[in-house]
């Protein structure tokens, strides 16, 4: 499963940046500096995101953190869909990183249509059902409790169910 996610993520990144990534290296090793992720935001989505190419660990973690902040605050990717900096930098949870890239692509495609394509299923849109007072009244009048029963939740008292005999604290049984 992870190899399929990685393949799709690699293709999406290459398509988005119009650049080929090194096929000999692992995708997550190439993303570890955070530069490629920030370039996606800056070049493809036009973000004003600052990043620096460096081999210093704290700079790389800042780049990753900048991507995560942009994804959550601007693209509105839910926090449960995003990875944490240590998941990528320390390679703690590779699958979560790949799933986050997929999720980021979907939310970015929704927010910036035509700039990037989304990976995986299309995001659903809320379509709340609004009923008029007349429709609600017709529904209430049309329900026959003899046919459908009661809409109240059953309880032990209403269903006359006893899971044990009643006990007296002195030990007597009823």
UniProtKB/Swiss-Prot annotation:
Presence of keyword Cytoplasm: yes
A Pfam family that the UniProt record links to this protein: CH
GO BP terms, alphabetized: actin crosslink formation; actin cytoskeleton organization; mitotic cytokinesis
UniProt entry keywords in alphabetical sequence: Cytoplasm
Main location per the UniProt record: cytoplasm
CDD domains: CH_SCP1-like (cd21210)
Domain Calponin-homology (CH): residue ranges: 3-109
Gene Ontology molecular function, alphabetical: actin filament binding
Cited PROSITE patterns: CH
Cellular component, GO, one term: cell division site
Subcellular location: Cytoplasm
Primary role: Has actin-binding and actin-bundling activity and is a component of the actin patch. Stabilizes actin filaments against disassembly. Cross-links F-actin and is required for the formation of the contractile F-actin ring.
Subunit: Binds to actin.
UniProt protein name: Transgelin
